[in-house]
Curated annotation (Swiss-Prot):
NCBIfam families, alphabetized: RNAse_H_YqgF
Recorded coiled-coil stretches: none
Family: Belongs to the YqgF nuclease family.
EC supergroup of this enzyme: hydrolase
Predominant subcellular localization, coarse grouping: cytoplasm
Pfam families: RuvX (PF03652)
EC number(s) per entry: 3.1.-.-
Protein name (record): Putative pre-16S rRNA nuclease
UniProt xrefs under HAMAP family: Nuclease_YqgF (MF_00651)
Length: 139
């Protein structure tokens, strides 16, 4: 069963997909969105759902360190609700605290990636971490 993991931001959505057995997550791409214009990348997401035969979504929930809802929690939940309606697939939420920080650290310390290049992959890597954390919790 393939699962798509999403890191929903205000300008981009990082996308990751699980392997067919649901053990590992791989970063796929970053979908540009524009909340102000109501552009949320659902057409591209539909292509990915079809191509990978996805059966579930996992959306990162950006909670605060004290476990309260952060400013983006509502937006992430609204995105999750919309994809549930559009694709009629289950949507689960995964705490994403510090995934972007973890992704940034990995890119700097382990891969020595420049700031400009980090911006191009950070959301995809964060989505991968969100999905991998979910998969690890499930197995």
């Amino acid at each position: 069963m393939r699962i798509i993991g999403l890191d929903v931001g205000s300008k981009t959505v990082g996308v990751a997909v699980s392997d067919p057995l649901g053990f590992t997550a791989q970063g796929l791409e970053i979908i540009p969105i524009n909340e102000a214009k109501g552009e949320f990348g659902f057409d591209r997401l539909a292509d990915l759902v079809k191509d990978y035969k996805v059966e579930k979504f996992v959306v990162g929930l950006p909670k605060n360190m004290n476990n309260t809802s952060g400013p983006r929690v509502e937006a992430s939940q609204a995105y999750g609700k919309k994809i549930k309606e559009l694709f009629d697939l289950p949507v689960e939420y995964q705490d994403e605290r510090l995934t972007t920080v973890q992704a940034e650290r990995m890119l700097v310390e382990q891969a020595d990636v420049s700031r400009g290049k980090r911006k191009k992959v950070i959301d995809k890597l964060a989505a991968q971490l969100i999905l991998q954390n979910y998969l690890d919790r499930m197995f």
